[in-house]
Swiss-Prot record:
The lineage of its organism: Eukaryota, Metazoa, Ecdysozoa, Nematoda, Chromadorea. Transmembrane segments: none annotated. Pfam families: Motile_Sperm (PF00635). This is Sperm-specific class P protein 16. It comes from the Eukaryota. Residues 2-109 form the MSP domain.
Length: 109
């Protein structure tokens, strides 16, 4: 079971901007994920919860509002998805994360 981010890091202007990343499931099991941010004031993540099909990918959009240049990070917690799960946010509460992927975020002046 593996989950990777492509590209593996995010650089956006401190004045605001967005970046699209793919979460790629390299395994044979459907995965469920939750994304946590070290800076919820200046970053918006869509989606926060979701599923990634076996050998599939899911686009994640990172949007930054204007603010001082700063280093932050996203941590994607993931686990095998429950077989009957349809609501990722509700289902994630019932699983134990099996791994994480960290995406460093850099806001540049």
């Amino acid at each position: 079971m593996s989950l990777t981010a492509d590209p593996p890091a995010c650089t956006v202007p401190a004045a605001g901007g967005s970046s699209t990343h793919k979460l790629v499931n390299g395994g044979a099991d459907k995965l469920i994920f939750k994304i946590k941010s070290s800076n919820n004031n200046e970053y918006r993540i869509v989606p926060v919860f979701g599923f990634v099909d076996p050998s599939g990918s899911k686009d994640v959009v990172i949007t930054r509002t204007a603010g001082a240049p700063k280093e932050d990070k996203l941590v994607v917690h993931f686990a095998p998805a429950p077989a009957d799960a349809t609501d990722a946010q509700a289902a994630f509460a019932a699983v134990t994360p099996a791994g994480t992927v960290t995406i460093p975020m850099s806001a540049t002046a």
